[in-house]
Amino acid sequence: MEDKKRRLEELLQTPCYSIDFLPQPIPPAALSQFRTIQHHLLNSEKRQEIKNRIVNILLKLLCFFPACVLWDGWKEQSSPQLIEQAVDTVMENHSGSLYLLFWQEESLLVFEWDALSLSLYHPSQQLLNLAQTIARSEGFFLYQF
């Protein structure tokens, strides 16, 4: 477990890509308006639609890449129900994070409560290509921070 925690912390320091419902980062001049829109989306009926898209992205990626999941402790195998329940809990409680460590790819995917996106750290080229295709299939975009 210590190895996974250490690896997670190392990966958080590597190049990061965003799987986002927006096509590019928000410019500083538009942050206030974005926060208003983000608050609305996270606190309205739209939240369910966004949650479903995020869960779909995660589950599709898990079809191709095995991952250890950090949610209430490390899980070597994740179930679709665990992923959906974790994303739902994070969004409902407006707190928490879900981590997927793709150990064969040496990559990390993070979902945090205050984001309408996923953060993908140190993706292999294969993971990056597939993540982009999957993101598009769910109406999301992939770009590097």
Provide a role label for each language-model segment:
Residues 1-117, 122-145:
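Structured alpha/beta or helical-core interaction and ligand-binding surfaces enriched in interleaved
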